[in-house]
Amino acid sequence: MHRRIRTHRSLGAIGAGLMIFLAACGTQGSSPEASPSASSGTGEPVEIEWYVGLGTGTNPEQIPIEEEQVEAFNTDHPNIHLTLTIVDSEEAEGNLARRMPTNPPDIIGPIGIRGLQGFGDTLLDLTESIESAGVDRSTIEDALWDVYQLDGKQIGIPMAVYPAFIYYNKALFDEADLPYPPDEVGEQYEGADWTWETVRELALQLTVDSSGNDANSPDFDPASIDVWGLDAQFTNNDPRAWSTIFGGSGSIVGDDGSTAQWPDNWRDGLQFFYDGMWTDHIIPTKAELDAIEPDGNSFNTGRIAMDVVHQWYTCCLAGVSDWDVAVLPTGPDGTITSKLHADTVGILDTTENPEAAFEVLNWIRQNPTLLQAWGALPAVVDQRDAFFAALDEQFTPLEVAWSVSTLMLGYPDVPSHEASMPNFVEANAANGEFGSRLWTTPGLDLQAEVDAHVERIQGIFDEPG
């Protein structure tokens, strides 16, 4: 099902009535005709449709907030009539694909980097709109602007950012009588540099079987693990994500834009992940995870000591009562890499009203109420203190080291692990299949598997677009 919210007003009316109705996917009527400017010659407001469902924004607690904000926008902007269409996330991509040829919306989002790249050829270049609207680029870090550059087009404005860092279960550290991991870049752990090898050694001490033996013990039973020292959850089986977390920035696409590759640091990172599951047993396999949490939310079980996940994960850890966050370690390339998720909204180039659509986009990206509802760290720097203050109130009495989040923003993966690829949809699916194989199959020659995957990806890249 999808949900469309329209705010109806009569001409000259100050108030607005809200009507919500449900309709089956694919049965929407045509969008109302709109004039090519933000104020029609007839005095009628320009119609703009905002399509939500390709990322966050569909949770039950988020929808009323989005509805209220759209109603407020329409009250404050008599020249634009904004319609909010909310589609279940499981159906949104297919629903939009069916609409694109004849009845596309104007604005899509929130949508992540991976999703936005899939629409790259159909997105409006925002460069001129950004300049004409006087958007202050200095309020957002340069590295975040670069994320939304595609083939010379600025396809989005940084809106919501979600750096990755380590969430850790303080109770499990206390049980093991181990110090907590560092919350400052450059800080050592027990006299050792904070590297992935240090994390591995720590995770071995935190991984415990049902008899209480840690993974360093000769009596450790990997068939009956009770607590795992490490995880990197919610990656959509994407081996590019695992390679980036443990290996650093890289790209599956060569500099020529058409050659498939797997950089050496990515190979090292993926080997770390694979060995962590099948050799060291410090990371849960797919079968082990399914046994404790079929939905994949491993940290929330209380049985994961350290978990690499993003800022948005504050949505989903009610099951752990005492936790904090730590900085990521340096990788095999000698640098820290915080795998970045980022949401924005984009304008489809089929819009008949680009000026009005950009006015809406600019309102969405700066709306603190929406950003808080989405659990989104604002890309605009001066909005962040209020965001973290709200989180402190939410998680009282915990005193979370939120400075970690802003520190990790300084180490994004550039290029993004979710960046554009030739034949994006097919290549993305192949990556997921490869990731699933690694997650479920022991005893593989990983480097040979990577070679075979690169060969497969090259074949996909070479297919006519």
Sequence positions of predicted segments:
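Long, aromatic- and glycine/proline-rich binding clefts that accommodate carbohydrate-like moieties
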Residues: A326, G375-E433, R437, P464
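Short, solvent-exposed loop/beta-turn-alpha elements that line the ligand-binding surface or hinge
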Residues: T127-I140, P182-G191, F220-A223, W228, ...
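Extracytoplasmic/periplasmic solute-binding protein
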Residues: D151-A160, A164, G191-T259
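Conserved N-terminal structural module of periplasmic/extracytoplasmic solute-binding proteins
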Residues: H2-I5, L11-A13, C25-G120, E131-S138, ...
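Short helix-initiation/N-cap motifs at beta->coil->alpha
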Residues: I86-N95, G191-T198, T285-N300
